[in-house]
Regions:
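Positively charged n-region of N-terminal signal peptides that target proteins for export
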Residues: 1-4, 8
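Bacterial Sec-type N-terminal signal peptides, specifically the leucine/valine-rich hydrophobic h-region
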Residues: 14-15
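Short, glycine-/small- and polar/acidic-enriched structural segments
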Residues: 38-183, 187-192, 196-204, 219-220, ...
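Pocket-lining segment of extracytoplasmic ligand-binding domains
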Residues: 105-106, 185-188, 193-280
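Secondary-structure end/capping motifs
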Residues: 243-326
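Conserved C-terminal helix/tail region of periplasmic/extracytoplasmic solute-binding proteins
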Residues: 314-344
Length: 344
């Protein structure tokens, strides 16, 4: 899935007697979940901006809402879809949303280069989902196979730095790769033969989607070739919220972790809840693709070494160091500038 978005519209959905609606606003549509709680007391509203339309990555949120876990913590969570690529970080930084789901390396870059006052409060995915993907017929299984090839990407500095790193890792010449800015068209650029491979596709989404469409594909992971392991998704809050609303953020993380525990225990139930909350107009979901996506995500959202939402100083240090080395950031931010570990 891409990290650049169009304006969104949505229709009302009905889920197990609990209504889910979408309302417009200058900061993009909001999915308001009403019901599924204990019905007692006033709830504190939390606006949560997703990185994309609802998909398997967000299933734990919808499970937690459906089962009333946020309400039991005194929270009413409003899910908001981004209207622009950086809404999850920009709206949170400006105090126009409470929590965003965004990307670790973008958080580092925003803090280091622009002093954007946000930090990660929890890692949703413990490793990279981004891959180098190609049709199997292209015979590409490592960076060395990219020499002399056209590689599609979304035109970002980060992707260029990743390609430089993986080529250097295998002793190959970066200048031998022809990077082609294909914008949003990562999959179609491969299937039409415009490029030989792409960087920017996600192993949990584009791989099962292309396989469902009948394509044989191959891919390799970036962190096997010199790119540090990074968190594909992190929850963000702004500095003021971290300083003043720690208990609220802790309650959100606690309820989210309960939703994830249920996702692990009953993935088919979680899939049904997700499908009932999909944005059919703008991003209809395939049950087969989302089931495959969940199977990929579950062991990456929590590992034997890292609990769901945990984040390590080592991961942050390695990514800061790599980004500084690649010229992606102007300075190395302190760890406390980019992450906080909130007990929950």
């Amino acid at each position: 899935m891409k990290k650049i978005f169009a304006l969104l519209t949505a229709a009302a959905l009905l889920l197990s007697g609990c209504s889910v609606g979408v309302i417009g606003g200058e900061d993009g549509p909001t999915q308001v979940y009403v019901g599924g709680g204990d019905g007692g007391g006033a709830l504190r509203e939390l606006d949560v901006v997703l990185d994309w339309y609802p998909n398997a990555l967000h299933a734990f949120l919808y499970v937690a809402m459906e089962k009333g876990y946020y309400a039991q913590e005194g929270l009413k969570v409003n899910i908001r879809f981004p209207s622009n690529a950086n809404d999850a970080i920009s709206l949170v930084a400006a105090g126009r949303a409470d929590i965003g789901l965004y990307y670790q390396q973008d958080v580092i870059q925003a803090r280091a280069n622009q002093a954007v006052p946000v930090k990660s409060i929890g890692a949703v995915v413990q490793g990279p989902l981004n891959i180098v993907l190609s049709l199997a017929e292209k015979d590409i299984s490592s960076p060395a196979d990219l020499t002399g090839k056209n590689v599609g990407y979304a035109g970002t500095e980060l992707s260029e730095a990743i390609v430089r790193s993986i080529m250097a890792n295998v002793g190959a010449d970066y200048s031998g790769v022809q990077l082609v800015d294909v914008g949003f068209d990562l999959m179609s650029s491969m299937t039409t033969g415009s490029v030989d491979a792409t960087i920017g596709c996600l192993v949990n989404h584009e791989v099962p989607q292309m396989e469902e469409e009948g394509f044989d594909v191959s891919w390799f992971d970036l962190d096997d070739y010199g790119v540090p392991t990074y968190y594909e998704g992190v929850f963000l809050a702004n500095d003021t919220a971290v300083e003043q609303n720690g208990e609220t953020l802790s309650a959100f993380l606690r309820a989210s972790a309960r939703g994830f525990a249920d996702l692990k225990a009953e993935p088919e139930e979680a899939l049904a809840i997700l499908l009932a909350n999909q944005n059919e107009e703008n991003f209809p979901l395939s049950e087969t693709v989302e089931r495959s996506s969940m199977a990929v995500l579950l062991p990456m959202m929590e590992t034997a070494e890292a609990a769901f939402l945990s984040q390590s100083d080592e991961c942050w240090r390695e990514n800061i160091g790599w980004m500084l080395e690649q010229g992606l950031i102007d300075r190395a931010p302190e760890l406390d500038e980019v992450r906080v570990n909130i007990p929950f």
